[in-house]
Amino acid sequence: MSGEEDQGLTEALELWGGLECTVNRVLDEYFSQMDRNGHIHRLCDIERFASLGIRSIRYPVLWEHLAPNGLDEIDWSWPDDRLRALRERGITPIVGLVHHGSGPQYTSLIDPRFADKLAAFAGAVAQRYPWAEYYTPVNEPLTTARFSGLYGLWYPHGRDERTFVQTLLNQCRAVVLSMRAIRQVNPDAKLVQTDDLGKAYSTPQLSGLAEFYNARRWLAWDLLYGKVGQEHPLWDYLISTGIEPSQFLWFKDNVCHPEIIGINYYITSERWLDQRVERYPGHHITNYRGYRFVDMEPVRVLATPTAGVEHLLAEAWERYRLPLAITEAHIGASREDQMRWLLEMWQAARNARQRGVDIRAVTVWALLGSYDWDCLVTACKGYYEPGPFDVRSALPRPTAVAGLMRELAAGRQPSHPVLEGQGWWRRPDRFTCTPVATPTAITSLHSEYKTSVNGTMRPILVTGATGTLGRAFAIICGQRNLAGILLSRQEMDIAVRASVECAVARYRPWAIINASGYVNVDNAESDIDRCFRENAVGPSVLAAVCRERDIQLLTFSSDLVFDGRRASPYLESDRVGPLNHYGRSKVEAERRVLDHHPDALIVRTSAFFGPWDIYNFVTLALKTLAQEERFSASTDITVSPTYVPDLVNACLDLLIDKEAGIWHLTNGEPVTWVELAFKAAKKAGIDTSRLDGRRGGEFGYVAVRPLYSALSSERGILLPSLDDALDRYIRSRRQEAPAEAEERKSGRRGSGMAA
């Protein structure tokens, strides 16, 4: 962080980091992000953060964690170790004291003594760390007040204007008193005040409501700046709550404007308001201030994109003339779109600086990812969004976002090929309803943002054009704007080097995904040469060519590389011992590929099912049982099923991350085939009385199968649970029923990987 405020725009734009550290309360339960992401137990994370090249970090020294029973019982060892480690690595901490919280159980956001109690804690922190210069005593006071006092999501679960305004006043007063207590120890301490900043757009009929929202968004900063009095546009609204005017006017006598205004900007920060509710999905309909209307993200409905964060930065600068920083830059999306979003935020900040806006930094938010923000942290569901590090491994694993951060911090040109494509928020398929044309949202797309939808991106070549897996990659690459090119054997025979070299020269891919192969396990016992050609020779040729041309390679292996003598899921490091020729071909492929290309990615998976073919086990079981016919499945062969969309998405993330070596990817739960059929039928509401369990030996298999081939991973559990996957599969099958009927009618049939 730049040390002198008058340096302004002479300093380069800085890259900061932020740790998702929310401790919010729902009823009497506290949800702690640091407990979920494991940082509470890992001092070694500091070294990981330092490796990103960040200059400053928004770092938690949280009231709820340190003083749950009062200031007399604080154990300072946790922040002592971590703040010391940050200083040793030259990273400036921006110390956060409350992050979407309501304090320990002995207070709350409606406690008249909340501000005094937080100020006492802030003073204790300053006494302990008198060198600390930058503070955010309360993160996002306006947003927290809305969620806790108006929407009823978090404690104290208010749903009225008075509770909303009172919780906002208490938090802002706490900021003032906390900074006063801190400055008694360190007079040079500086306030970095964060909040979400968006903008509301509307139809003409709702322009008054949009105007109200657009005035309300500034309210926390206005209070701290001493701008709220009878001249304020929301004065009548504020005093209509019944709160004494003196509580608002107190801030005029106790001005505590930030040294840096922190702008948190998300794809959901801006809103579109429309009274024509029949045009939109029902879950977006709401009622407020006498209106019934739709409230949703403009990006999903407006034909012309809004001006976005660059324009909002300029608005904040014109309003306050104080230095700014983007203090949260994150999007919950696939890996490439996370990178595209971060780069767009960085470019927007640079553009704003060129227009004279004093913006100091862009903060990459959620260095360790975040949990359950899809439900606004109202329940502990386990939904995880990774960030620069993915904590679903034994130790946090750097993703491609970390690589982009290092390039930005070092001033290098971002180099990842996926950055050549547009994010979903700029693509034609972003709409969830009929697009609305409006003059109120005027785009200011910078030329740097106008990256390609498909034309100029370097592609990913995908083999296996006739197979289920290859087609799935083609579908999902299209959904993620990754320019996948699906090739048949005629277009590229992977076992013929000249054919591979010709395709590589023609398409210039940055990655190749080998989704082809010999899949009939029983036929492989007599068709050995062909099996080994497709499953071992072909991947080894791809590996050699990819290594020579610096192309990333993803290829697939199988659970059938194991002998089944274990009674617990196999890990990547377990000894292989195939029982059949198919398994032997996969073992040989693994050996050859890694010999030729040590940076190749090999994914072992098993028993997959999905919505885009009608011949996988789960689909056949449900179809047969639904037709009131008998269906048999083995009771003594245990596998770990894999949902194809989950598999493909995780594989693409790992490929973008440049992961290498062998990974196991399944939806986790070991089940027998009959248990899988039973579980799926129950979820689909299909009668299971005609489901028969039989021993594997009764099915007349030619090739020997391992009795236990379930997979787990020591490298990372990346896929959702089997129950979650089956739920989504069944919903998808119902939605895809017309397409499935057309596929049956036309007689198309794809091969799948061996179960």
What do the predicted segments below correspond to?
Residues G158-Q166, R533, V537-V541, V561-V603, ...:
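Catalytic helix-loop patch of NAD(P)-dependent Rossmann-fold dehydrogenases
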Residues R497-E534:
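NAD(P)H-binding glycine-rich loop region in Rossmannoid oxidoreductase-like domains
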Residues S526-L554:
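NAD(P)-cofactor binding segment of oxidoreductase domains
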